[in-house]
Amino acid sequence: KNNLKQSKISISLDKGVFSELYQDIYFDKTNCIQESKHVYLDTNNLEKKFKNINNYIIAELGFGTGLNFILSWDLWNKNHIKNSSLLYISYESAPISIEQIKNIHKLFIGLSHLSKILIQKLPQIWQGTHQIFFEFGNVTLILIYNDFLSLKNFSFKADTWYLDGFSPTKNSSAWSNELYNEIYKHTKDGGSLSTYTVAGHVRRGLSDAGFNISKIKGIGNKREILYGYKNKVNCKTTKKPVLRYNDIGPVAVIGAGISGASLIYFLKKRNID
């Protein structure tokens, strides 16, 4: 069953980057980078965390234009410690076409070096899980084109969640108690989340799921945003992050040489023996 919706985008001076499907903006053209940095990166204190945590996992509901990913990748590049990795798991139920993303990314001043690499590696739009490697495999983007509740089929725990699924009044499927419970299950002890919406039912739903939720100062037109965290029990880990999303394996590679070695490398990256 194909659960993907067809995204329709318009760009204008008054509406910014606008979703015709959800009748809501992705972001204001003039302030998009500052807003995303504040709501997601700064609120979750990622600069400090990247300097202190070896293997970091960010999960996101709403890949959208890829802006949050590029900003996180850029921040990690500037602040990560030696031999560390970034795993970025993002869900999207209405993917934007690569051509539209190219046009939108022209707005991302100062990020073109990463934007070009991402656009070159973006997959074609088909429902499923797409794994993309950057920085010699130290940054991994797992892009899941499916509905958000497909989260139930994956086994991982994130250090940080970005909840970026349009307004609850425009896209109710991104804001349900069932989904909040799944997010909580998929969050490490001591892990955090943030979102631009402060709707009462979102605050209550995340709180009922187990998060400590508070409203904090926003930016621009967003006067307040939400920040939450999961109580810290023991979040120390030395293991490299693993995302399990299939039961493939073991796999036998017949033949040596560059092709065989490359295949073994990528199977290992997908945790397939």
Segments from the language model and where they lie:
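A short glycine-rich, Lys/Arg-flanked "PGG" loop and its adjoining helix->strand segment in the class I
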Residues: S176-D189
